[in-house]
Amino acid sequence: VFPLSFAEFLRFNGILRNPPQGGFTAKEKGVLRRAAKDYLERGGFPDVQDVSDSMRVAMLQGYVDAVLYRDVLERHSVPSVQALKYTLDYLFHNYARKTSTRSISGVLKNLSVAANRESIADYLDWFKDAYLIYPVSVKSDSLAVKRVNPDKYYLIDTGLIRAMCVKNDLERGWLLENLVFMALRRGSNKIAYYLNGDGTEVDFHVFNKLARTSRLVQVSWDTADKATFAREFDALVAARKETGITDCTIVTWDDEGEKDGIRIVPVWKWLLAW
């Protein structure tokens, strides 16, 4: 069972069964904002929608355990169950960030957990095959560039992330980025992150394999943090210049506008297209 899309989440919960695609009333905007917050926090698995918060956490943790045992431990010869579990825990706490077998190996070593990099690479492949994680590589045709720029890993559901992490470890910007990735994954898209020549990054370079078109998507929680937003905006402008891609969007939590030909779209509106 895969998580619901935002549109499916709305229908499943009886919220704006036919949300407008154009203008929104103030009431509709309020409803969609609240729904987006619930979607981010609960996630999209149907079975956990109508239960208490504590029951939801228990069910989602049980889901991870079931996948771990059914899809990994029962199918593969695992050299260290402890290392396997610590690797998964690391991914739940470091999603949407560059992650390598070297970095995971270093963390495990500090925890006195033995695991070589080859085994960790196997664990990552098995988690991917079990649809728990999705790797995203740097946009490049060069194997050398890909070797020195590790993949980023996204989780299948933000509700799972919240269930597996203590509250103080949750960072809303990373959650929003994971939510945007999972929406992009639903299309016929090849997704990478884009590295500019100056070292700055754009979260997603998206190539639609059917339409043969490309777009750039940056995720920023809001525009209020001027320094952070300027850094993310400037990176997108640089990528637009380097790639020639004109379809550029910044997805925020609730800010909307346009700047220098770049759309700024709140996630509750952006998700309706996916």
What are these model-predicted stretches?
Residues 213-224:
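Active-site ExK catalytic segment of metal-dependent nucleases
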Residues 244-252:
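Short, hydrophobic beta-strand segments that form beta-sheet elements in well-ordered domains
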Residues 1-7:
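A short helix-turn-beta junction within AAA+ P-loop NTPase domains corresponding to the substrate/partner-engaging
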Residues 50-213:
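Accessory nucleic acid-recognition modules appended to NTPase machines
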Residues 253-274:
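Domain-level recognition of nuclease-like catalytic cores that cleave nucleotide substrates
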Residues 12-21, 66-70:
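Conserved AAA+ ATPase "sensor/coupling" helix adjacent to the nucleotide-binding pocket
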Residues 222-242:
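Mg2+/Mn2+-dependent nuclease catalytic core
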Residues 22-63:
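Amphipathic alpha-helical "lid/sensor" segments that cap RecA-like P-loop NTPase cores
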